[in-house]
Structures are given as C-alpha cells and as structure tokens.
Amino acid sequence: GITGLLFLGVYLRFGFTLATPIYMLLVAGLVVVTFVDLVDWTIPNEITYPGIPLGIVCAGLATIYPASNLQLQSIVSSVAGAAMGYLLLKGLDMFSLIAFKKHGMGMGDWKLMAMLGAFFGFANTILIIALSSFVGIALASPMIYQKYFGGDEDENPMYLPFGPSIAIAGIIAMFCGPQLIQGYLEFVGAVPQG
C-alpha cells in the first residue's frame, strides 16, 4: 500500500525519466528500513552498503545525462553529502556518549544518512538532518504526551528509533528538497525572491 502510493508519487513527480526507477528503488529501500528499524531497531546493511555507491554512481550518470531528472548532478557533492551525513551523525552519537553516557543513535543511522547524502548531495544532507529532527519530534509527541500528561507513571526512559525519521525526511527531500532549500534561502534573504 504505502510503497505503491510512493511509487505513484515518484512517477507523477519525475515522469518517464531515468530518475523514476532509481527513486522507486530508493523509496522501496527506505520503506524497508523504516519497518525493520521500528520492529528490530536495526537498519539493514544490505540496503545502506550498496546504496552509498549507487548514489554516487547516480550523481555521475546525471552529470553525463542531464535529462535524467535526477536531482544531484555532481559527484563531488554526492561524496561530500555522504561523508557529512555519516560524520555528523557519528559526531552527535559520540557527543551523546560523552555527555549522557549512552548512545544517541546507532551506526545504522550514520550509514543511512550517508546513503541519502550520496543520493542528494551536500545541501540536501543538511536539509534531511533538519527535517529528520522535526519528523522525530512529531513521531515522539504522542509518547511524550502519554508519559507526562496521560497518567503513564512508568519511570523507564522512552526510546524511538531514528531511522524512520531519517527515511521520511529523505523522501520529503526527494520530492521537494530543492524547492525547500530555495524557499529557505529566499526567506532569510540569501537569494532574491523569484
């Protein structure tokens, strides 16, 4: 159901171009990641390990074939996005380990962010990290409400896997990342409104 609707959305957004089957494959992987992480608290390496080089290859294809409709058309930005996504989430996890004596996220999250960085590049990696934080807050809000206002007296800490938030943010960036970045830059006055 969900995957079929997302496939339809990809086709409607990208049309009959090279981007459509590539983004359908990416979406299918992100749906799998979401449900596996929700159930098992793991993100399959079988998706992230091949996904990182595939994203870089797609950036190269888009450089050669601009009509592909792929968003990213720079191998340098693809590699930079993968590196930044991985290192930033790893850094946040290390900070959490030092400050709170526990991991803030797992290695699967780092690799998933690297994969999305490879597909969408440096600027969209920043967007995906920001969006995933907002998505995580939205997903956690019912749990937080129940714990503090719903009479749940359980003293155990609440945990929610971060992979689904990253996956949802990646899908948002795929559909409208460039428009969101452009809108933000216009809002802060970094570029003239067009």
Describe the residue ranges of each PLM region.
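C-terminal structured domain segments across diverse proteins
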Residues: 141-145, 158-160, 183-191
